[in-house]
């Protein structure tokens, strides 16, 4: 009976582990992972490793990142930063990593913004399908509120838009990186998105205070 109980317990444990299996995303040093599902993330890495890892639940996810290859020129390190890329993919029980072209000079690496020829691959080198877009911002790059920009992007019908949890993230969890002006921007943005009845209720609530 004890042996049967041990086997039964082992089977339940294995079943539980299998049920909770997830995606492991490996992120190289040259990738600046800004947001995952419109949230900031903390990557796990060892001291001597040139990569970091992130565990995700099975299903659909959105990653927001920059590609920053580094080139040695004499005593200097030249960093070529891409535009911000928004990408959405779906996977289950996969070990996923980034794959980028090999560039031998900063000048050639600048072509990445035009070509966007990168991949997500599993451990067997199979490509993971994804949708992508560049998050272009024409104003001052310093102090950008990326979470706000991505939340706004996610209201569009672009294939890379991420609808899961969008409203919760937009209203409650966007960090105020630009002071009170960010709250004002969001207020104007969602007011314009509202229907006429909602606008009237909102204006009435302000008038009554």
From Swiss-Prot:
Keyword Signal part of the UniProt annotation: yes
Coiled coil: none
Signal recorded as keyword: yes
Alphabetized InterPro entries for the sequence: UPF0319
Keywords, alphabetical: Signal
Residues of the signal peptide: 1-21
One Pfam family in the UniProt entry: DUF2057
Disulphide bridges, residue numbers: none
Superkingdom, taxonomy of origin: Bacteria
Family that this chain belongs to: Belongs to the UPF0319 family.
Protein name: UPF0319 protein VF_1616
């Amino acid at each position: 009976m004890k042996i049967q109980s041990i086997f039964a317990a082992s089977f339940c444990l294995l079943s539980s582990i299998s049920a909770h299996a997830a995606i492991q995303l490996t992120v190289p040093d040259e990738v600046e992972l800004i947001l995952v599902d419109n949230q900031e993330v903390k990557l796990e890495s060892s001291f001597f490793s040139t990569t970091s890892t992130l565990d995700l639940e099975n299903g659909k996810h959105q990653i927001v990142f920059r590609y920053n290859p580094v080139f040695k020129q004499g005593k200097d390190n030249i960093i070529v930063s891409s535009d911000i890329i928004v990408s959405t993919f779906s996977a289950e029980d996969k070990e996923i990593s980034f794959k980028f072209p090999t560039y031998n000079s900063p000048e050639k690496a600048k072509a990445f913004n035009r070509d966007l020829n990168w991949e997500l691959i599993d451990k067997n080198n199979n490509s993971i399908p994804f949708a992508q877009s560049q998050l272009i911002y024409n104003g001052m790059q310093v102090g950008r509120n990326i979470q706000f920009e991505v939340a706004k992007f996610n209201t569009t019908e672009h294939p890379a838009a991420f609808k899961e949890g969008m409203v919760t993230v937009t209203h409650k969890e966007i960090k105020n990186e630009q002071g009170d002006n960010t709250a004002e921007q969001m207020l104007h943005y969602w007011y314009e998105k509202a229907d006429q009845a909602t606008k009237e209720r909102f204006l009435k609530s302000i008038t009554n205070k």
